[in-house]
Every structure is written in C-alpha cells, then in structure tokens.
C-alpha cells in the first residue's frame, strides 16, 4: 500500500512560488508525481484575478457587479460594445506562471533528487472560464475565444518545458452542473456535451502534451457550490471524458472531489459505490480527493478503505478535494502532511 502517491491540486498559500513549491515537497516529496506552482498570484481567489486581468486588458467589462462572497454572487462580465472577443485579446497568465516557476522547479527537483518529478500547471477549462466570467450566454457566444487563448498558452508552455510539464484541466463549472442536476445529470451531459468539450480542449493542444483532469465542485472561501448525493455524476463525467480523449495527448490522471469545501467526505459506503463503474484507461491514475481537516486521521483511514473497496483496488494517489490556497497556512501544511500519512497507510 506504500505505492500510493500524493497529489496537490495546485493552489497553496505560500509567500512566493518557491515557498509554495518547497512546502509541498517538504510534505510529500518522494510521493509526488507532479509539482504545482502554488498559483501564488491567485491562490485565494482562483479565477477571479484572471478575469480582473481580462478587464484591465480591455477584453471584458463589468455587466453586473457582484460581491464575490460566493461564486453565485460573482461579478458578471460582457464584451465591450463594438468589440469582438478573440483569443488574441486575452492573456490568461498561464505562460507567465510557468516561466516564473520553471527555474525554481528544476532547481528543487535536482536538489531533492527526484528526476521523475514533473511540473504541473493548472488552468480552468474554456467552459469553466467563460461560464464564471460571463454566465451561460458567454459560453454560448464566446467559448471559442477562451479556448483559443487557453490553447495558445498550452502550446507555448509545451514548447518551453516539453515533456516535463503536465497541464491540469480544471472542470469546475462542468462538475457543479452535473452534481446540481443529479439524477438528471446524464441528460445535461449529453445536451451540453461536457465530456466532449473537455476532451476537445486537449485535442486542440499539441500532440504529446500531457494532461490531468481535476473535476471540482468549487471551494471559494472553503465553501463548495454543491454536495453530491453520491459519486455517480463524477463517474459519468469522468467516463465521458475518457471515452472521447485523444489518444496522442496522454491523460495521466483524473482527480475526484470526494469532499466539498468545509464538508468532510461521507462515511456512507453507498456514496462511493459508483466508483465500481469508473472506467479509466491504462496509464491514467485515479486521485482520491478526500483529505480533510475535520475527521480524525483514523476516520480518514476508514474513508480510504471505503473508497478503495468501491473502486476495487488501491487508489493511485490521495489528495484534498481542491487546492489548499483557500486555507490558512497552518491548515494547508497540516493537510499536506496528512495526505502523505494517509498515502503511506
């Protein structure tokens, strides 16, 4: 059982990129397959700083001002009058994040003697970014622009780093919509072609680009948008993604949200039962996002047993349900250490 890895979703409350990356390595270095940057420019607010940058760039303007106390109360944007939104108008910041982190990553990897470690760059899907920035009308009218801007950065990062990077696609809006419409989530997935859209984003990137997929239910201010009744919506969406995934863009992992913000993972075996139907391809790891600060370690060990019994095998890695950037630093450090301890059980 010691072969389980540890996965960090991305954000971490570090004072700098180096501080965040060192903290994650200190907690679980030998168990890490990928090392995120910590997303220290945006760790607390996730997509909000990206959208605010787009306003500053003149690509978007405020349509309806919100408080951002929750994603439901977010600010909604539109394209300025007389302009047509294109990918060339938008700098999403991912390339700059990779450029800043690359030297730090290479130095830390060499110092820790972890030659197999890969840099991880997280980015929301085009659907999620358009949905959060502009609502459903934005998805309908402007998704291509967000896709083009995202693919431009993926291409540039691939050229910069080569095979030493995994791009983590973060499908928050897709997963929240699936969970909210349960038990009608299959109809929603078919109507909006959510899995197809995630796979199509990968297919638009250069051949050989390595990916992971983080299916997320949100954690703004450590509050989730939704709590699943069981894991059926996750399994259905993950299987849809895998079925349509391009064969020449390796899908290295799928990460599942098994907790929900401040709500700990379920103690009901039935919640995890749909994992028996999860159909990942060979070479795609399953990362269980259940590490949480509310239960005791002993309770979390029991939860891990429920997950693995439902899955029918050991998980490939353990993780929190979302990034640790919305948590105070002492809690983030404790959760990182807990992940390592649970992986070792």
Predicted regions and their residues:
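N-terminal basic, low-complexity leaders that serve as flexible interaction/assembly modules and, when applicable
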Residues: 1-71, 107, 344
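Acidic (Asp/Glu)-rich catalytic clusters
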Residues: 25-26, 69, 104-118, 158-162, ...
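Acidic, His- and aromatic-enriched active-site or binding-groove loops in soluble protein domains
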Residues: 59, 63, 140-153, 184-205, ...
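Active-site-proximal, glycine-rich beta->alpha crossover segments in alpha/beta enzymes
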Residues: 69-162, 166-193
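Active-site-proximal loop/turn and secondary-structure-junction residues that shape catalytic pockets
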Residues: 125-129, 171-175, 217-221, 258-262, ...
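Conserved, mostly hydrophobic/aromatic
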Residues: 150-151, 213, 254, 318
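Aromatic-lined glycan-binding groove of carbohydrate-active enzymes
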Residues: 194-283
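Catalytic-face loop-and-helix region of soluble metabolic enzyme cores
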Residues: 243-345
């Amino acid at each position: 059982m010691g072969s389980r890895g540890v996965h960090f979703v991305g954000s971490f409350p570090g004072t700098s990129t180096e501080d965040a990356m060192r903290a994650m390595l200190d907690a679980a270095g030998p168990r890490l397959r990928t090392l995120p940057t910590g997303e220290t420019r945006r760790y607390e607010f996730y997509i909000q700083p990206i959208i605010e940058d787009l306003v500053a760039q003149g690509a978007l303007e405020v349509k309806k001002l919100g408080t951002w106390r929750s994603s439901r109360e977010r600010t909604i944007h539109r394209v300025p009058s007389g302009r047509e939104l294109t990918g060339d108008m938008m700098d999403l910041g991912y390339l700059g994040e990779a450029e800043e982190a690359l030297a730090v990553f290479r130095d830390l990897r060499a110092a820790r003697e972890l030659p197999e470690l890969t840099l991880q760059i997280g980015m929301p899907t085009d659907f999620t970014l358009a949905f959060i920035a502009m609502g459903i009308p934005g998805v309908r009218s402007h998704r291509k622009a967000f896709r083009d801007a995202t693919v431009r950065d993926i291409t540039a990062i691939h050229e910069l780093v080569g095979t030493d990077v995994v791009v983590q696609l973060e499908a928050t809006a897709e997963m929240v919509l699936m969970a909210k419409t349960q038990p009608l989530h299959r109809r929603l997935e078919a109507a909006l072609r959510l899995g197809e859209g995630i796979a199509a984003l990968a297919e638009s990137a250069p051949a050989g680009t390595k990916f992971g997929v983080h299916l997320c239910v949100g954690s703004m201010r450590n509050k989730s948008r939704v709590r699943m009744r069981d894991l059926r919506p996750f399994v259905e969406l993950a299987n849809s993604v895998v079925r349509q995934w391009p064969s020449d863009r390796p899908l290295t992992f799928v990460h599942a949200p098994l907790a929900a913000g401040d709500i700990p993972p379920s103690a009901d075996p039935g919640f995890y039962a749909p994992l028996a139907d999860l159909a990942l391809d060979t070479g795609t790891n399953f990362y269980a996002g259940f590490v949480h600060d509310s239960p005791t370690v002993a309770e979390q060990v029991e939860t891990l047993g429920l997950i693995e019994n439902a899955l029918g095998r050991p998980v490939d890695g353990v993780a929190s349900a979302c990034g640790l950037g919305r948590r105070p630093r002492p809690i983030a450090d404790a959760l990182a250490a807990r992940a390592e301890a649970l992986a070792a059980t």
